[in-house]
UniProtKB/Swiss-Prot annotation:
Gene: aroD
Catalytic activity, as annotated: 3-dehydroquinate = 3-dehydroshikimate + H2O
Source taxonomy: Bacteria, Pseudomonadati, Pseudomonadota, Gammaproteobacteria, Enterobacterales
Cited Gene3D superfamilies: Aldolase class I
Pfam families linked to this entry: DHquinase_I
PANTHER family found in the cross-reference section: 3-DEHYDROQUINATE DEHYDRATASE
Protein name (Swiss-Prot/TrEMBL): 3-dehydroquinate dehydratase
TM segment ranges: none
Cited function: Involved in the third step of the chorismate pathway, which leads to the biosynthesis of aromatic amino acids. Catalyzes the cis-dehydration of 3-dehydroquinate (DHQ) and introduces the first double bond of the aromatic ring to yield 3-dehydroshikimate.
InterPro entries (UniProt xref): 3-dehydroquinate_DH_AS, Aldolase_TIM, DHquinase_I, Type-I_3-dehydroquinase
Residue sites binding 3-dehydroquinate per the record: 21, 46-48, 82, 213, 232, 236
UniProt cross-references to HAMAP family, sorted A to Z: AroD (MF_00214)
GO BP annotations listed: 3,4-dihydroxybenzoate biosynthetic process; amino acid biosynthetic process; aromatic amino acid family biosynthetic process; chorismate biosynthetic process
Length: 252
């Protein structure tokens, strides 16, 4: 399987990489969080731009990105505006969403962008091509905060992300039962064994799905999200606890 290397971090081999989310609402809280996060041990920093209030100003967004980059120059930075329809904090037009991502790509400050699969195939493909032309990787994502689709449907979505050029396909779903968690793990394993030619990230959310955040190395998920202070999605656990369990499973 092809790995993805970002700032000397090899995603897709060994232990799942730990991603943490920074969710400051203004420039001061972004800076404070970024400085505080330097004390934590993790692999990738996701900036959840949908928590930032001044998204109407691209300049403000880029200023905040610069603050984060200056605070942590060596950590891979993932730029994520999560849409309201997929569990994010704000509603913006597709055009604004795409222009924010392009501005982030142009800035040279981010290593990866998160691009939602259901933004529209033509726009997704154009943005992937634009990112790759600027040496920025694409995590292509889909989130369902209400249910868990069938394993077949989840595999189809992940395969579509590959077909559209995602460097790392990602899916996160909400379980309504323990069986749903098994469905997500089944889809992950099937993808890894039969279709994936690049790293994939999957998770089942909430308390019920916590096992999926820990068992990535077993079933084929290349990264997992942990919390430094505040969780960005239900079911995330503290980064130190997360790393301990990942290491136990890795060394077993």
């Amino acid at each position: 399987m092809k790995t993805v290397t970002v700032k000397n971090l090899i995603i897709g081999e060994g232990m799942p990489k730990i991603i943490v989310s920074l969710m400051g609402r203004d420039i001061n809280s972004v800076k404070a969080e970024a400085l505080a996060y330097r004390e934590a041990t993790f692999d990738i920093l996701e900036w959840r731009v949908d928590h930032f209030m001044d998204i109407a100003s691209t300049q403000s967004v880029l200023t905040a990105a610069r603050v984060i980059r200056d605070a942590m120059p060596d950590i891979p930075l993932l730029f994520t505006f999560r849409s309201a329809k997929e569990g994010g904090e704000q509603t913006i037009t597709t055009q604004h969403y795409l222009s924010l991502n392009r501005a982030a790509i142009d800035s040279g400050l981010v290593d990866m962008i998160d691009l939602e699969l259901f933004t529209g195939d033509a726009d997704v493909k154009a943005t992937v091509d634009y990112a790759h032309a600027h040496n920025v990787y694409v995590v292509m994502s889909n989130h369902d905060f209400h249910q868990t689709p069938s394993a077949e449907e989840m595999v189809l979505r992940l395969r579509k992300m590959q077909a559209l050029g995602a460097d790392i396909p990602k899916i996160a779903v909400m379980p309504q039962s323990k069986h749903d968690v098994l469905t997500l793990l089944t889809a992950t394993l099937e993808m890894q064994q039969h279709y994936a030619d690049r790293p994939v990230i999957t998770m089942s959310m909430a308390k019920e799905g916590v096992i999926s955040r820990l068992a990535g190395e077993v079933f084929g998920s290349a990264a997992t999200f942990g919390a430094v202070k505040q969780a960005s999605a239900p079911g995330q656990i503290a980064v130190n606890d997360l790393r301990s369990v990942l290491m136990i499973l890795h060394n077993a």
